[in-house]
């Protein structure tokens, strides 16, 4: 499929952490929004890791919103899950916000982390989304 052949006006980006959406598919976001497609982003984890103080969460969210504004993103959702610990919480708590955003935005395409990504949070999101799509017959 070519990018110009998208038959719907909604795309969803699911990212583990603030900045993953821009680093992963920033150029693709710009292409789609430039075509008038509504791009929505769900950032699952809050960004509070050992390398950042809790106050950095607000700054990371502000930076994500600035980038989204530049890219003309429709909406950014911050789901507030624990950063670098998605493997330590029930998977249902990870999949619920994903399901909610898919139901709300009704995307034709969902972008998620690459299957070869080494980050544990990224791997979990990819695995859960793949399982969920198989269960729903996509």
Language-model-derived ranges and their functions:
Residues 97-138:
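Active-site adenylate/phosphate-handling loop in enzymes that bind or generate adenylated species
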Residues 1-105, 131-135:
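Active-site rim/loop-helix segments in enzyme catalytic domains that contact anionic ligands
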């Amino acid at each position: 499929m070519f990018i110009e052949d998208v038959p719907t006006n909604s795309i969803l980006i699911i990212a583990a952490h603030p900045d993953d959406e821009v680093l992963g598919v920033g150029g693709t976001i710009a292409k789609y929004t430039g075509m008038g497609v509504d791009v929505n982003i769900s950032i699952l984890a809050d960004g509070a890791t050992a390398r950042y103080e809790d106050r950095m969460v607000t700054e990371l969210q502000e930076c994500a919103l600035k980038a989204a504004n530049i890219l003309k993103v429709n909406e950014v959702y911050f789901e507030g899950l624990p950063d670098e610990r998605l493997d330590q919480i029930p998977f249902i708590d990870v999949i619920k916000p994903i399901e909610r955003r898919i139901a709300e935005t009704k995307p034709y395409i969902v972008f998620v982390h690459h299957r070869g990504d080494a980050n544990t949070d990224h791997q979990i999101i990819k695995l859960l989304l793949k399982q969920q799509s198989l269960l729903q017959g996509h």
